[in-house]
Amino acid sequence: MSAPLKRTPLAEEHLAAGARMVDFGGWDMPLAYGSQLEEHHAVRQDAGMFDVSHMLNVDVGGADATAFLRRLVANDVARLATPGRALYSCMLNPQGGIIDDLIIYYFAPDQWRVVVNAGTADKDIAWMQRVAAADGFDVAIAPRRDLAMVAVQGPNARAKVWAARPAWQAASEPLAPFSAAAVEAGTLVARTGYTGEDGFEIVLPADAVVQLWRDLLAQGVRPCGLGARDTLRLEAGMNLYGQDMDELVHPDQAGLSWTVALKDEARRFVGRDAIEQFAVPRAFVGLKLQERGVMRAHMPVRCAQGMGELTSGTMSPTLGVSVGFARVPVGVQPGDAVEVEIRGKWVPALVCKLPFVRHGKAVEHS
């Protein structure tokens, strides 16, 4: 018998709003509240909000916290010197495969926060504890299931958050992208997101999230589900763990070489040896379909250099054409013509640099 689905503190709000609920990594989550297309456009044109409380905030503290994180992840947290600053990184296994992709916040040398994906949370915690024990780091790893998280995204997102919580504006208005600030006791506002739009991700006590959700609703922020979240992140050129990368995929094969910091030779992060010895046979590219049809994950891609495969694909509501990500042979370049097999027919597609959409506007691809 399968385990019952986990529920976030906003589960009753979703049901009351008529959400279609689905199993997402063992969590009962909203797919859409009505029109997925309208939810997508709300984020691109105004403001939408997502329940992301299924994701896990993990506090990492102790005398060795910085050294531990420099060992644990491929990006170098030492570059974070200002409290509240954050970076994106992959956590690798010894073979260089991606265990998870994370956002890491710096507060003090002995005080950090790591945000991990819902479906990998238990695996991630176990791996963090294993690395800490193996190298004897003096760290405390504390999963924070007492916290909830709401992402408010779109060109009007910040203004609507401030309308709902005027007291938060002074601390959060100066934030640069990938920065966070405490706006009240126990509540963190970060200028981050997964949509390609401006906005905030708000981390707060679980018992306070329902009132925040209702107050944002009163300001005209539209609830959005996983369906719109997926089309938005695809347009924005953002990977989804478990679909675009996993433990068998190196960062270079997922378009994430920019998250691997190799400059400090003395920093031997987990997976570094494999990364340095690995000759990358595959590249990660964007594709834009040139005829009617919709690209989906696992469809074959035919290139002049050989065969590849789609990892993600959808119909782009902003562009009105199908877009996707593909792992293809090295040598495939933006501007190249390739073909995607859709229902037994080879359909032409254009290789593109990512993203497809930036701040609500189409990115030009020749």
Swiss-Prot record:
Any one Gene Ontology molecular-function term assigned to this protein's record: aminomethyltransferase activity
EC number, as in UniProt: 2.1.2.10
One GO term of the biological process aspect: glycine decarboxylation via glycine cleavage system
Catalytic activity of the protein: N(6)-[(R)-S(8)-aminomethyldihydrolipoyl]-L-lysyl-[protein] + (6S)-5,6,7,8-tetrahydrofolate = N(6)-[(R)-dihydrolipoyl]-L-lysyl-[protein] + (6R)-5,10-methylene-5,6,7,8-tetrahydrofolate + NH4(+)
Record-stated family: Belongs to the GcvT family.
Purpose: The glycine cleavage system catalyzes the degradation of glycine.
UniProt-listed NCBIfam families: gcvT (TIGR00528), PRK00389.1 (NF001567)
PANTHER family per UniProt: AMINOMETHYLTRANSFERASE, AMINOMETHYLTRANSFERASE, MITOCHONDRIAL
Official protein name in the record: Aminomethyltransferase
Organism classification: Bacteria, Pseudomonadati, Pseudomonadota, Betaproteobacteria, Burkholderiales
Name of the encoding gene: gcvT
